[in-house]
Every structure is written in C-alpha cells, then in structure tokens.
Amino acid sequence: MDLRELRAQLGLTQQGFAERYDIPFRTVQNWETGLRRPPEYMARLLEYRIRNDLINCKTTVLPEYDPRKMDLPTRRDYVGALSWLKAIRNVISEDFVFALDEALMCQGLFGGRNDEYIVWVYGSDALSRFNGIVVLGNRISRYCVQEKNGLRFTDLNRTLSDSMANESILDFQGITEALSRYYYSNNESFLGVSVAPEYQERFERLADDATDYYSN
C-alpha cells in the first residue's frame, strides 16, 4: 500500500487524512516517510476503506441535460416513487443498484420530489448514456445491497455513508427525512444505524436535525 499516493488521490493533506480516518497526525507522517510501518491487518483495512471512498467520491459534478443522451421516465408522470423506479429499471434493462435518494425511496423512508431528475446508481459507466444518471461506483459489496419489489438498492447504513462521502453535491433533505422516519418508527431510537468513525461527528449533527425534522 502506497499511503502517500492513495492520500493524494483523495485530495487530502496529511492533517485532513489523519482526521478523516481517526489516525494520529504523527503516525501518518511516520508511515509515509517509512520511519514506521502500519501492522499488516491495519494496512489492509485502511486500504480497503480508502479505495471504497475513492469509488464513492468519484462524482464531483452533477450532470446537465444532454440532448444526445437517452431520456429516462420522468418522475411527474408517475403517482408513486416505486412505480417511477420500476419504470427506470425496465428502460435500463441491465444490472445496477439504486443508491442515495433512490435507495431511500426503495426502503420506503423518503417520498422523493415530483421534479426528481438525478438518479443515483452503482453500475457500469455505460449507464451514463442516460440523462440524469449519476454512477457512484462500478462495484458494491453484496452485503450492502437489498432487494424488494424487484428493485436492488443500497441498505440504510451504506446509503448513509454514501451521503456523507458525497455531501458536497448532495441535497440532504432525503437522508434527513429518512433518518427521521427511521427514528420515530423505531421507538425514538437510531439502534441499528452505524457509520464509519470519520463520519460519526457529522452523523450526530444530522441525527439532531432528523429528530427535529417533523417538528419544524
């Protein structure tokens, strides 16, 4: 594992890297200079998490409408979110996994918007031939994927982590509403919800917003 190269790909300083992965700053310096080496199990785990973050953060700009691309069914033509997502699945007709807001719709935790345009997915880059599609990554662990109503989508914890990783381009209304519904349907508890350590502080702020969501 070339830590310096992976850190550079993330676009992080040593300090930013240390804070993101909850590693002492001096330790990061020592690992990069070769003064010390991380234990093998830790190196493997860290590399796995970094590469996942690189996949999740591959999208930095939302796509604009391109008349040369194919159009997907529009949300306003369907009464419910699920019927819209099924129509999208039928048009794409290849293997993919719904992510972020669309995953929350599949989970029944977010109703979506009537003017919805962006569709977040995991799958082949070839899916970008459709207007509105944003490919978060080409691969995702089957342990993070659920299936219901003939739709495949990321589970809540993966959806939450993806939201944190893509915060700079994501409207947080969906994940905030979803967490609020989860909280109040589980006896005012977030039991079962978990995030990586680097997202814990951000999650706690988001959880506060979620508990107040329907009272505002």
What are these regions (language model features)?
Residues 56-153, 162, 169-197, 208, ...:
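Short gly/ser-rich loop at a beta-strand->alpha-helix junction or flexible surface loop bordering the NTP-binding
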Residues 11-29:
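Short alpha-helical DNA-recognition segment
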Residues 23-37, 68:
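Recognition helix of helix-turn-helix/homeodomain-like DNA-binding domains
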Residues 40-59:
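DNA major-groove recognition helix of helix-turn-helix/homeodomain DNA-binding modules
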